[in-house]
Amino acid sequence: MTKYIFVTGGVLSSLGKGITAASIGTLLKHSGIQVGMLKIDPYINVDPGTMSPLEHGEVFVTKDGAETDLDIGNYERFLDTSYLKSSNFTTGQVYSAVIERERAGGYLGQTIQVIPHIVGEIVKRIKEAGEGHDILIVELGGTVGDIEGLPFMEAIRQMKHDDEVEGTFFVHVTLIPFIKAAGELKSKPTQHSVQELRRIGITPQMIIARSENALPKTFKKKLAMSCDVSSDSVIEALDAASIYDVPISFLRQNILKPISKELSLGELNPNMEKWDSLVKKIVQPQNRIVLGFVGKYLELKEAYKSLTEALIHAGAHLDTRVDIHWVDSEKIEERGAEALLGDCDSVLVAGGFGNRGVEGKIKAIEYARVNKIPYLGICLGMQLTLVEYARNVLGYEGANSIEFDENTPYPMIYLIDNFLDQSGNTQLRTHKSPMGGTLRLGEYPCDTLEGSIIRKAYHGEKTIHERHRHRYEANPTYRKALEDAGMIVTGESNGLIEAVEIKDHPWFLGVQFHPEFTSRLQTPNPSILAFVEATLAISQEE
């Protein structure tokens, strides 16, 4: 039977529950344990697919095409494992399932209530996510005391006494504020948070204490006594130079000892040598490059979480610090690309939706192409390379994507009416289709061209597999004209254009897929690694 570790948060949000869960999972995995991960989101949205990146951060796409919380990305990057749609569910999904079952007569006339029906559905989903794993780590979004989280708290409380559950362990992540005027660390917020948990019926067995300052031994003992945990179960979580240093910090504090004791896991000795070596290269690299990151959601950098982490992964393997120079694409429209990208060693244009900042991205692409600067365009960043090339090389005045101009005389990017999904089924869509769930999502194969940059990046693989999240496609009508003018299609999937390159450019690649979704610290994505490697090599030649 599966054992469960539940991670909750107290005092306030954004304390790092996801990194905590991922770090514990990493140490357990490196100890030879089969670990599953689950993020529960108490919001009522069915999924984050239609939520603003500026409000929620990045939407992470799983291998099987689910639009999930960005913490699933943290789990994959830390544990070097691909998780599926069962690794994330929301209040919206729970209520939808219960209401649908009620409408179909599945409850045989019962009055549907939070207890037992909603809570029962939550428990069922947690157990399903745990199937096939030795341990399932469950992160509960939000903060203890939130109204939205109460049914989930009740569900994990009930699982303590479930005969089908072999063991449970509760981890509580909380804040230890430092009052500068008094020069003191304060434990009261944590004590009150633990008291709130106890009122619900949950007693945490471990406290992860987030703090800017180191916790003295006397303070740890006081915290342990007031929260009714053993002294070795108070784990200090200081601000780290890199999030990838957190598992190492936890290991130094012997975090696995109380977990192993409670869950009867035996002696655990995780092998973290390779991990530690990569972290040292992140913190103290030998080389440095400056990358111009052109985007539109710069008010919240979390909107590009997977991509910025993928650049860190690549840099670690090349012993290089990738300094990101953030460039708002709307500012390029005002000031020009040269003014904002002139000091950059390479240019990356990220994906996005909507026409805000599009012309600025096109100017950035032109700047990288004309000045022979290494360039990587992802999703919309690839689509706009076709638009830029059509306008400025082919002379197609007014060329555009129909996403931004339905009446363009040269629709370089168009809405494909039907496509084959992951199961091989034909999907139909139009511009009137609902926004939620109508994208091309998940992992698809891509056939690469021999001798191309992308074939070389993937070590000669003829067919690669990467994840997608987009609605529009490159229009094959203009393929011959583009290729005759020097822009070559180097990646295809069932007739769809997946990657393009430019003949007379040292390193220029546009990809329709999102390579960042498959990048991990120990196994960086090949196309992003090749991009950073080319940037470093060309910058060192100058």
From Swiss-Prot:
Give a GO biological-process term: pyrimidine nucleobase biosynthetic process
The broad enzyme category this protein falls into is ligase
- Binding, ATP: S14, L15, G16, K17, G18, I19, D71
Asked if Transmembrane helix is a keyword of the record, the answer is no
Keywords attached to this entry: ATP-binding, Glutamine amidotransferase, Ligase, Magnesium, Metal-binding, Nucleotide-binding, Pyrimidine biosynthesis
Q: GO CC annotation: what is one?
A: cytosol
Amidoligase domain: region residues = 1-265
Q: Where is the Glutamine amidotransferase type-1 domain?
A: 290-541
Family according to the record: Belongs to the CTP synthase family.
Q: What is this protein called?
A: CTP synthase
